[in-house]
UniProtKB/Swiss-Prot annotation:
Family of this protein: Belongs to the class-II aminoacyl-tRNA synthetase family. Type-1 seryl-tRNA synthetase subfamily.
Gene Ontology terms: biological process: selenocysteine biosynthetic process; seryl-tRNA aminoacylation
Enzyme class: ligase
One annotated Gene Ontology cellular component of this protein: cytoplasm
PANTHER family: SERINE--TRNA LIGASE, SERYL-TRNA SYNTHETASE
Name under which the protein is recorded: Serine--tRNA ligase
Function of the protein: Catalyzes the attachment of serine to tRNA(Ser). Is also able to aminoacylate tRNA(Sec) with serine, to form the misacylated tRNA L-seryl-tRNA(Sec), which will be further converted into selenocysteinyl-tRNA(Sec).
Positions bound to L-serine: 272-274, 326, 428
NCBIfam families to which the protein is assigned, alphabetical: serS
Amino acid sequence: MHDIKAIRDNPAAFDAALKRRGLAPLSSSLLAIDEKRRAAILASEQAQARRNAASKEIGEAKKAKDEARAAKLMAEVAELKTSMPEMDAAAKAADEKLRKALAEIPNLPLDEVPDGTDEHGNIQHHVFGKKRDYAFTPKPHEDLGGALGDMDFEAAAKLSGARFVVLKRGLARLERAIGQFFLDVHTGEHGYTEVNPPLLVRDDAMFGTAQLPKFAEDQFDFIKDRTISEQLEQTVVEIDQRKVRPGHFDMEQKVTPLSAPTRKDRLWLIPTAEVPLTNLVRESILDEKELPLRFTALTPCFRAEAGAAGRDTRGMIRQHQFTKVELVSITTPETSKDEHERMLSCAEEVLRRLDLHYRVMTLCTGDMGFASQKTYDIEVWMPGQGEGGAYREISSCSVCGDFQARRMDARSRGPDGKPRFVHTLNGSGTAVGRALIAVMETYQQADGSIAVPDVLLPYMGGLKVIAKGL
């Protein structure tokens, strides 16, 4: 979410940044909405102020026994009382119109981000390792897994449809080992706090990290009818004063729906643990002495992949359900850039220990995510992909500035005592399913078996090679 005051102060800079994103200028239309919003709010505030003043004057007139003046003032108050709800509604509608318009606009790129229109404008930052030489033609993971009998797409299709997989025996254990290894490194060495978050979240959480409203079609959601008792339970939780700050709770809004026998609530399956982890600080004022906060989670993730029709239809590269280790940092504005570099190095470290060849790309303005100011992609080498192998994304590490914090109302208080918005960062540390693919294709042997990387041996119960039936 953008700061309308910043747009007001420098509309040309805002439009110039949007141009780098490939978007038309928007400052004029936003400022026009803002002007109407401010006028509506001012009119509402002036009406309230006049009503308060007139009410006080009524008492003074009656005290002075000026009945005519008292009657005139009472008529004025009655008229204001009649017109004010409409004025308040107009102010609220104008505010919501601006909020909706701002919510549709992506974050602005940092100055050092390269300009470009798509992935062809990305710049290679650095490379780790080298491509391995094989005395045979490397096979893709789906062929390896199928021959082992441990990767079953047909059974998954019967259960759930396309873009799902059933893993068994050695491959199921190998995927579990990879995820556990990633978590152990990030929590034990990199200082991240492990979190086991809900996999279902509400609209506000998805809005906070900017999956909504723009990317609703890429998500899985469902509607649940909540009974009166369920609604009451939720209302009681939200009334708890430890969770409610002044100005953030509308009793009428909470109680009115209870008159209905049921209410439809929508929940979303998380597309990434970034959503619950980042929203842990929503509607909070943190002590800056506690920052940075670093969270990590190993979770299933769910994506509809609405725009991926026809792409990566074979194998596990693009699934509706996949496992990922997520890294999230909450920082001050002064430290977010350094934290971004640190997060990248943490994601790289687990791949280095697996001895996987990869490259790091700095994404251009046309290829960055909606909420990102700057993104590094880690692309791991998969020797069985395409003709002769291919680099495939296994991690994206992004710094978002205060873009998500404004949507979540997440702030911190520094030495001067004034609250300000925190900066948020997120990255994959890394995608476990794609790491499994990279390990399978990199460590495959001529007989179709897969050697287990040394760092994963402690997690494999003595299994050193995954072969058919093991």
